[in-house]
UniProtKB/Swiss-Prot annotation:
Keywords: Chloroplast, Membrane, Plastid, Plastid inner membrane, Protein transport, Transmembrane, Transmembrane helix, Transport. One of its GO terms (cellular component) is chloroplast inner membrane. The chain crosses the membrane at residues 18-38, 64-84, 87-107, 124-144, 172-192, 221-241. This is Protein TIC 214. Belongs to the TIC214 family. Disulfide bonds: none annotated. Coiled coil: none annotated. The gene is TIC214. InterPro entries: TIC214 (IPR008896). It is found in: Plastid, Chloroplast inner membrane. Residues 248-300, 788-807, 1580-1607 are annotated as: Disordered. There is a partial copy of the N-terminus (positions 1-379) of ycf1 in the inverted repeat (CAJ32441). Residues 1582-1601 have a biased composition (Basic and acidic residues). The keyword Transport applies.
């Protein structure tokens, strides 16, 4: 058995290997290509079928295979692939070839040479067959395109190592497939030829020449087929001549384009930015940028994709003199001003420099030369680029609109450029090589002889590089070790930490550049320093550097040999310096103005250097004189850069741009670009209409202002922003089945499309009635079932109704679209509607009125002329726009024939046969009126009425219906009366007849009877007779009693029915009457029967069985007589017997019917009772169970309780599935968990004896907290791979993320799913009360009076960062080996010996609600523009931004809101305080929450403040407002910034409520957010604030003291105003002019920082639009009151919406959930340090710990002896300052980040023996690792002390972990912030070596 399984396993693995091998996969792909049928197959087929002679067949197959081979080679060989893929290659191949082909087929005799004896291969026809098959192989595949196949091949090529093997095996597979295919084809053809059944076909026999004709015309058929196929795919390719050319943005750009780059292959260059070009400096990464580039000034976060800008100090600028932009054949020039003085001719120099005066050469070029060059230029252009101007959108490029740029960015410029460069001392291929540098290098090589370039051997390079690197790393190591040694000496100074050099602004005042802009601290930054520079400084610096900058750059001689430089130099050096110094001001102002005209819209932050007065000073003469002089030597751009050379310079990587600025159809319609109104649109946008709602006709200077909406077409948008005249991409595998279809569907998903109604039926619906019959008997089951069914039925009805409405709506829209799409349809429809309306109003309705009244007169009724005419006059026909916006009766909408029209009929006339007097309308009529829909309709084309435009025509109330109803009523009444009389008469006649009959019978019988009596009296005794009478009487009485009883029962049952309280009494009364009538008739009948029986009784004879009558029977005669009489008796009694039987049946049935409802109700009550009892008993059982367990308390927010947390009481465990969280998020969370307060039970756990007594449950719990003794744990080292991550998360989930956390993190559907594996254990709450997140609080910590802020720039904080790194490292790596951690190392007694007086406050380390460790101030993480580069994590719940109304629920539910900690100080009166706050909120209104005036009092009352999320209000009254980049709603800027950084932290409510206002402010404050432009903001002590250092300026206390101060805006605000005013003028006509400042601010803010969404649900939307329509009507009417009232009555217009408040507060909007605020996901270039902190979540310490006084320095120092014993100080420790134990977990933190990185990299490069495969080899092999105590000079063997190994892990841990994290989230490749992770791409950092 074992042997067999072994064999089987081998077999399987062998099979798997074979299947996965390259050869097999190649063969498989080769086979697949056989099925990609293309037009080439047509030729092959034709050759095989048609051509005679083997040569043609062979040539066909050869051509076919050759073509396929070429296609295969193109997969592997890129140039061929590119050549075949280019559109022009296909065009050039296909068009001429097709022409030739048609010619060939139609005029064959031209080429028919007859039979030749030459070599058959030279025969033209054979060559044609070969070419046919070859060329068509290279064309695109047609029927089954193999794009998928090609993609698969590419993927596999990317994956597999042996590419050539794959390609060859693929080709072999293809060859085999095609050979098989061709053989099969041949066999089929042979079979067809030989098959007699085909030949003997009747049709073929009858047409003898059919086959012959087919064969003759086959060539034609094939050519037609080919033509169709070619047209099919050539439709994509625009012809090179007929293409619609696009207009350029300006003439200068046209020139640029004409001089565009000569070679299509090198696509690095493209257009300049045209008139808006402005450049400064050069890049480090890209020293010679490509000529197609642009620059931008100022910083916009959105532009990071396009530019990478680096700032350097301006003084270094002069070094970079050579900064030319080169193309392969020449230079492009861009005019930088629109000045008419000097017109630039087409010239060769592309001059974008700022730092030097190369431009001079430009102006002095000889015009002759230029013209000659221009003539030459046409011939230089290759044919391809002439035919196919790749500059234009002739290819399927999508135009990406960009609001902030003039032109769109070119996409064909690759982000990656491959070239060789020196790296690690070796020549390597770099994929981010600057393309311009490589082209420049090629040009240099071409010009300069190669011998002159020094060649260095690779070995030399290598050794040299290694040696220098070694040297540097040794130096670094030495420095590092020196610092460590100083640490060992227990030095108190902080100099051991590496200090950073600051960039100084002013030496005397010791003023530093803000950290934000400091290139030394922060890396090269991209913002400009906004600091005005005096003109005197500019003059001096300009004069100093003048000569240097006017010099020529001699390197141009290499490239341009034919230029006469002498004349140039003479002109250049004749500059007179004196006039220059005096006239510099005028010159600069002039330049400013020139710049303003041509400046790009990017230049938001450009500053004007001089005041307006100074600028006005220059007179025109001086200007012209000076300009004439200057433009012969200078470029305005040049000088401009000169003026800026003092500030920080801007360097930018340029991006190629298109020269076109395209506008969409929509833009054209909306008239956005009025300057280009004459221009036609170039982008096809989705079909839309501009619907004008309202035009303002007031006489203003401007044109009429129109309020318009854009209404989009509902049909599917196949334009998709395509550029007119560009190539279309053919969409495959999609089909459109309907006339109007929103989306194209793939055939794969046909089953998902809703089926047709005809074929859809539900089997369950068919089965239900059958089941019903079976379940009738089981009463209880039946009742329950019916209840469920009822609800289901109702739901289904609603669903069906909704679907039906939806379908109708879709049909309506389809009709609307149809009218819109069909040409001229609107005109026809418009005229038809107008004619219909006229016909209706003036012909049809009056005719009907006349006819009706004449009819009434004929029927002798009074005519109703006045009433009818009144109603007719009441009808109004209002013209509406196509979308149904009302105008007026006379006014027609603009362009109504083109855009369409609707006619709305208000109070539509309805012809009534008579008018009822309206004095006392009946109740029923009133009900009817209420039910009636709104009294309006739309006129259709056929004159019908429809509820909605294009809706289905509604039913008109019929004229004759009420007449027929009235007739029916009258006939009914007449019938009733007639039949009653008939019945009565009938009854009476019957009675009379019966009575007469009976009397006659009785009379005859009585006579006979009397005779007999007379005879017999003498014989018979009298006594018998009496007895007989008794018997008969008793019988009768009994029967009577029975009937009485039954009647009584019936009556009772009726009484029961009557006794109920019925609402519709009238209806029930009538029913009751009917029933009583029926019962009375039954009674009467019964009485009648009884009477008849009584009449019968006298005929009963004397009983013959009596002994006395024996004598009678003796004679046979008498016996016969008796028999006879009996027989007759039976016969006539039978009739009555039958009647009685039927009567009985009738009564019994009636009774049972009446009793059914009673019985059913009884049953129902019984069953419900049972259910309730069952439910109660279950609940009791559950309650008992719950009471037995320990109750788990959850904090629920009352409003969300029902919807979000559907967790039943039974399943109240934490639901968590770790796979649903993003690892980065959990990582971040876990890193922030605080230090646990171990002191209380640390001593218990330190000894071996304890382990025996502790329960395993407690042990496990302690294990998760990491506070257990080493004896109780595994000793082996764990593997640090995936298991570790998983286990680590598993160990943490219980206490790190509370129930609320999990519920917030996980989506609803996952939350409700019960996850049994991760059940939270009900632990003893008293044990873990100080570290459990279950005790989330909204409450505040104890406040410190000191409100000094913590700033990141403080070097001393490195100590705290160490702690953060350490804690995180300790948690992750060491989650099991916690024994050796610093937390549980020292027994408690030892600590006591060391005189550590530690008093733990009860509130020590409770967690804040927010997940930031410690109670740190929010400003720790706030800087300008802190917006993380983050994207939404879909698994994370975001706040819904709906604000909870406190006013509604008053004080009831606040307990649910505020989770009050049970362990808190008993003195705090929390509840009362909270309620007070709520009361105050109610009084004050939404925006202004009270802030406590007296801090001492409030601290006494409660240490916890209600609205304190994450300790965000340090003191609420002490809130600082930062100088942020934006100030849209200054009240909550600070909070909002936090929200952007950590959106899961703060609920939206507190963005608005924790405001920095005092009582007196709140009362007086105006609720205007946007300041009008005329108001100037005057903030006190502005200058004072500017002088103060940031930390003081940001103090909240300042704000508190100034009671009546308006919100403090940043200084940036005024700059913004100024900039916007400037930028508006600079923009010119291209952009919209902002009317006020507010608009500008809003625009900037919305675009740059926030995303505001107005969200309303469908119902509100509908109402809104209805209102808009009504408003539009009212605005146009002269007397609108009547319509207004009626529309309000009809609920057409809702007053709540109509009431537009003048200043609607933001909170109201947010309360309603209408305004949603979200940060735009921006990619912000932030400093690396900050992102690092954000990702790992470094535990920053509370600001109270960071005091800059002497005490701080005394407390924090490092003790070498206790270096290992790092004891963390909880928040309120009192520390004995004599001895503090403090440790650096990560020693390399001594160095600052850049040096630290360098140290790691260098040490890494020097260790060549690292193992790539197992990156954790350091840990796995313990003996290889030396402990890091070598730094401290203490050497211990590793196996004795594991602590050292752990410390070693800490040493590199944070970055190693971060690397993993980065890889997990794919951050490290191809992202803008990739540089952050550059260090992380290195595998592992080896230990430092000591030489």
């Amino acid at each position: 058995m074992i042997f067999q399984s072994f064999l089987l396993g081998n077999l399987v693995s062998l099979c798997m290997k074979i299947i996965n091998s390259v050869v097999v996969v190649g063969l498989y792909y080769g086979f697949l290509t056989t099925f990609s049928i293309g037009p080439s197959y047509l030729f092959l087929l034709r050759a095989l079928v048609m051509e005679e002679g083997t040569e043609k067949k062979v040539s066909a197959t050869t051509g076919f295979i050759t073509g396929q081979l070429m296609m295969f080679i193109s997969i592997y060989y890129a140039p061929l692939h590119l050549a075949l893929g280019r559109p022009h290659t296909i065009t050039v191949l296909a068009l001429p070839y097709l022409l030739f082909h048609f010619f060939w087929n139609n005029h064959k005799h031209f080429f028919d040479y007859g039979s030749t004896t030459r070599n058959s291969m030279r025969n033209l026809s054979i060559q044609c067959v070969f070419l046919n098959n070859l060329i068509f192989q290279l064309f695109n595949h047609f029927i089954l395109p193999s794009s998928m196949l090609a993609r698969l091949v590419n993927i596999y090529l990317f994956r597999c190592n042996n590419k050539i093997l794959f390609v060859t095996s693929g080709f072999v597979g293809w060859l085999i497939g095609h050979i098989l295919f061709m053989k099969w084809l041949g066999l089929v053809l042979v079979w067809i030829r030989q098959n007699h059944s085909i030949r003997s076909n009747k049709y073929i026999r009858s047409n003898k020449y059919l086959v012959l004709e087919l064969r003759n015309s086959m060539a034609r058929i094939f050519s037609i087929l080919l033509f169709i196929t070619c047209v099919y795919y050539l439709g994509r390719i625009p012809s090179p001549i007929l293409t619609k050319k696009l207009k350029e943005a300006s003439k200068t750009e046209e020139r640029v384009e004409s001089e565009e780059e000569r070679d299509v292959e090198i696509e690095t260059a493209s257009e300049m930015k045209g008139t808006k070009q402005e450049q400064e400096g050069s890049t480090e990464e890209d020293p010679y940028p490509s000529p197609s580039l642009f620059s931008e000034e100022g910083w916009d976060p959105d532009k990071i994709d396009e530019t990478e800008e680096i700032r350097v100090n301006g003084k270094d600028k002069i070094k970079d003199k050579f900064h030319s932009h080169l193309t392969e054949t020449g230079y492009n020039n861009i005019n930088t001003s629109n000045s008419p003085i000097y017109d630039y001719q087409d010239s060769y120099l592309n001059n974008n420099n700022t730092g030097n005066l190369e431009n001079c050469k430009l102006q002095l070029l000889d015009k002759k030369n230029e013209n000659q060059e221009q003539d030459l230029f046409w011939f230089q252009k290759p044919l391809v680029s002439l035919l196919f101007d790749y500059n234009r959108w002739n290819r399927p490029f999508r135009y990406i609109k960009n609001n902030r740029f003039e032109q769109a960015v070119r996409t064909e410029m690759s982000q990656y450029f491959f070239d060789t460069c020196k790296s690690d001392g070796k020549q390597k291929i770099s994929f981010t090589y600057p393309p311009s540098l490589s082209t420049f290098w090629k040009m240099i090589k071409r010009k300069i002889p190669l011998l002159s370039l020094q060649k260095t051997l690779p070995n030399e390079l290598d050794t040299q590089w290694v040696s220098t690197n070694k040297e540097k790393s040794n130096n670094l190591n030495k420095e590092f070790l020196n610092r460590l040694e100083i640490l060992d000496k227990e030095s108190l100074s902080l100099d051991i930490l590496e200090t950073r050099t600051r960039f100084c602004n002013d030496d005397t005042k010791k003023e530093y550049v803000p950290k934000m802009y400091d290139p030394l601290l922060n890396g090269l930054y991209r913002g400009t320093i906004k600091k005005g520079v005096s003109s005197s400084i500019i003059n001096n610096t300009l004069l100093e550097n003048w000569e240097k900058r006017v010099r020529l750059n001699r390197i141009h001689t290499i490239f341009l040999p034919n230029i006469d430089y002498q004349e140039f130099e003479q002109k250049a050096y004749t500059i007179d310096k004196k006039p220059l110094s005096t006239e510099i001001d005028e010159f600069l102002t002039l330049i400013n103005e020139l710049g303003n005209e041509a400046k790009s819209s990017l230049n938001l932050k450009g500053l004007s250097l001089f005041s307006d007065q100074e600028q006005r000073r220059a007179n025109s003469e001086k200007r012209t004189k000076f300009v004439k002089f200057v433009f012969n030597a200078l470029d305005p751009n040049e000088t401009k850069s000169g003026k800026k050379s003092i500030g920080i310079k801007e360097i930018s990587k340029k991006v190629p741009r298109w020269s076109h600025k395209l506008i969409t159809e929509l833009d054209q319609q909306m008239g956005e670009f009025k300057d280009r109104a004459s221009m036609d649109h170039q982008l096809r946008s989705r079909k839309a209409k501009r619907v004008v709602i309202f035009t303002d006709n007031k006489a203003t200077k401007d044109a009429e202002e129109e309020v318009a909406l854009i209404s989009y077409s509902q049909q599917s948008d196949f334009r998709r922003g395509i550029i007119t005249g560009s190539m279309r991409a053919q969409r495959r595998k999609t089909f459109i089945s309907k006339l109007f279809q929103a989306n194209v569907h793939s055939p794969l998903f046909v089953d998902r499309i809703t089926p047709l109604r005809l074929f859809s039926f539900d089997i369950s619906e068919l089965i239900k009635p059958i089941l019903k019959n079976w379940t009738d008997k089981e009463g209880e089951f039946k009742i329950l079932e019916s209840r469920e069914e009822q609800t289901k039925r109702e739901e289904k009805k609603e669903k069906d109704k909704k679907e039906d409405n939806k379908r109708k709506e879709q049909a309506r829209i389809a009709i609307e679209e149809a009218w819109d799409t069909i040409p001229l349809a609107q005109i026809i429809r418009g005229y038809m509607l107008i004619t219909q309306s006229i016909l209706r109003k003036y012909i049809l309705l009056p005719a009907l009125i006349i006819a009706k009244n004449i009819g009434r007169m004929l029927f002798l009724q009074l005519p109703e002329w006045s009433e009818d005419l009144q109603e007719w006059n009441r009808e109004m026909q209002i013209k509406c726009t196509y979308n149904g916006v009302q105008l007026s009766e006379t006014e027609f909408p603009k362009n109504w024939l083109r855009d369409g029209i609707q006619i709305k009929i208000l109070f539509p006339f309805c012809l009534k046969p008579w008018h009822i007097s309206k004095l006392y309308p009946s109740r029923r009529e009133l009900m009817k009126k209420q039910k009636q829909k709104d009294d309006f309709c739309f006129l259709t084309v056929w004159g019908m009425e429809a509820e909605l435009p294009f809706g289905s025509p509604r039913k008109r109330p019929s004229f004759f219906e009420p007449i027929f109803k009235e007739l029916e009523k009258k006939i009914g009444k007449f019938k009733k009366k007639y039949f009653l009389t008939l019945k009565i008469l009938k009854g009476k006649t019957k009675l009379f007849r019966k009575v007469s009959k009976e009397t006659t019978k009785l009379f005859i019988k009585s006579i006979g009877f009397l005779k007999k009596i007379k005879k017999e009296l003498s014989k018979v005794n009298l006594i018998v007779l009496f007895r007989f009478k008794e018997i008969s009487e008793s019988n009768e009485t009994k029967k009577e009693k029975d009937y009485l009883i039954s009647n009584q029962i019936i009556n009772e049952s009726f009484r029961q029915i009557e006794s109920g309280n019925w609402p519709n009494s009238s209806l029930i009364e009538t029913k009751m009457k009917d029933l009583t009538n029926r019962t009375s008739t039954i009674k009467n009948k019964i009485e009648r029967i009884t009477k008849e029986k009584k009449k019968v009784t006298p005929e009963i004879d004397i009983n013959p069985n009596k002994t006395n009558n024996i004598k009678k029977f003796e004679s046979p005669k008498k016996i016969f007589q008796i028999l006879k009489s009996r027989n007759t008796r039976v016969i006539w009694k039978f009739h009555y017997f039958l009647k009685l039987f039927i009567q009985r049946l009738y009564i019994n049935l009636f009774l049972s019917i009446i009793n059914i409802p009673r019985i059913t109700t009884q049953l129902f009550l019984k069953s419900t009772n049972k259910l309730i009892e069952k439910f109660i008993s279950n609940n009791e059982i559950n309650q008992e169970k719950i009471n037995n367990q320990k109750k788990i308390h959850f904090m629920f927010i009352s409003t969300i309780k029902k919807s979000l947390y559907n967790i039943s009481k039974k399943n109240s465990h934490i639901l968590c599935d770790l796979s649903y969280l993003s690892q980065a998020y959990v990582f971040y969370k876990l890193s922030q968990t605080q230090v646990i307060n171990f002191s209380k039970f640390r001593s218990v756990l330190q000894y071996n004896t304890t382990s025996c007594f502790l329960k395993t449950k407690i042990k496990d719990y302690f294990k998760t907290l990491g506070i257990f003794h080493s004896e109780l744990k595994h000793k082996k080292l764990q593997s640090y791979r995936i298991n570790q991550w998983k286990n680590w998360l598993r160990w943490h989930y219980q206490y790190d993320l509370s129930q609320i956390r999990w519920s917030r993190l996980m989506p609803k559907k996952w939350r409700t799913r019960v996850n049994q594996s991760c059940m939270a254990q009900n632990k003893n709450r008293n044990l873990n009360k100080w570290n459990s997140y279950e005790k989330d609080q909204l409450l505040h910590y104890k406040k410190e009076n000191d409100s000094e802020l913590y700033s990141l720039s403080n070097e001393k904080d490195n100590f705290k960062k160490c702690y953060g790194y350490g804690l995180l490292a300790y948690k992750s790596i060491n989650y099991e080996n916690k024994s050796d951690s610093f937390f549980s190392r020292l027994p408690f007694e030892v600590q006591v010996k060391k005189n550590l007086e530690i008093s733990y406050n009860s509130n020590t380390s409770k967690h804040n609600f927010v997940d930031m460790p410690g109670n740190l101030h929010i400003n720790n993480y706030l800087r300008k523009g802190n917006i993380l580069d983050r994207e939404r994590n879909l698994d994370r719940k975001y706040f819904d931004w709906k604000i909870i109304h406190f006013s509604l629920r008053q004080k009831g539910d606040i307990e649910a809101w505020v989770k009050i900690d049970t362990n808190s100080n008993p003195n705090t009166k929390i509840g009362i305080n909270n309620y007070q706050i709520i009361d105050k909120i109610e009084k004050k209104g939404v925006f202004y929450l009270t802030t406590h005036q007296n801090p001492e009092k409030t601290q006494k009352n409660s240490k916890k403040f209600f609205f304190d999320w994450m300790g965000m209000n340090e003191k609420i009254f002490n809130r600082p407002i930062l100088n942020l980049e934006f100030w849209f709603f200054p009240e909550f800027v600070l909070l909002y910034n936090v929200y952007k950084i950590k959106p899961w932290i703060i609920p939206s409510k507190f963005l608005l409520f924790n405001l920095n206002t005092n009582k007196n402010v709140s009362q007086n404050k105006n609720q205007n957010f946007f300041l009008p432009s005329n108001k100037k903001i005057k903030i006190k002590n502005r200058s004072q604030e500017a002088k103060e250092p940031p930390s003081q300026r940001e103090r909240g206390s300042d704000i508190e003291n100034k009671g009546n101060l308006s919100p403090v805006f940043s200084k940036h605000q005024t700059d913004l105003e100024k900039d916007y005013v400037e930028s508006d003028t600079k923009k010119g006509k291209n952009k919209k002019q902002y009317k006020s400042n507010t608009e500008a601010e809003l625009d900037l803010f919305l675009k740059r920082y926030l995303l505001f969404q107005l969200r309303w649900n469908g119902a509100l939307n509908q109402r809104m639009f209805e209102n808009i329509k009504v408003y539009c009507l009212l605005l146009r009417l002269i007397n609108p009151t009547k319509i207004t009232i009626s529309s309000i009555q009809r609920r057409e217009m809702s007053l709540d919406i109509m009431l537009i408040q003048a200043n609607l507060p933001l909170t109201d909007l947010m309360k309603k959930g209408v305004l949603i605020i979200e940060p735009i996901r921006l990619s912000v270039k932030d400093n690396g340090q900050f992102i690092m902190y954000q990702t790992i979540g470094i535990s920053l310490i509370h600001k109270s710990k960071h005091q800059t006084n002497q005490r701080y320095r005394e407390q924090r120092y490092v003790d070498k002896k206790n270096f290992d014993e790092f004891i963390l100080q909880p928040q309120t420790q009192r520390i004995n300052t004599e001895k503090t134990h403090f440790g650096l977990l990560v020693p390399e933190n001594i160095l600052w980040s850049r040096r630290r990185r360098e140290l790691r990299i260098r040490s890494f490069f020097n260790s060549w023996n690292w193992n790539v495969v197992d990156r954790n080899s350091v840990f796995c092999n313990e003996t290889n690792v030396k402990n890091w105590s070598q730094f401290l000079g203490e050497r211990k063997p590793l196996y004795k002390d594991k602590n050292e190994l752990i410390k070693f892990k800490f040493f590199f841990w944070p970055n190693y972990r971060l690397e993993d994290l980065a890889c997990m989230n794919r951050y490290w490749f191809d992202t803008n912030n990739g540089s952050r992770f550059s260090i992380l791409r290195i595998h592992m950092y080896p230990r430092l070596k000591i030489n």
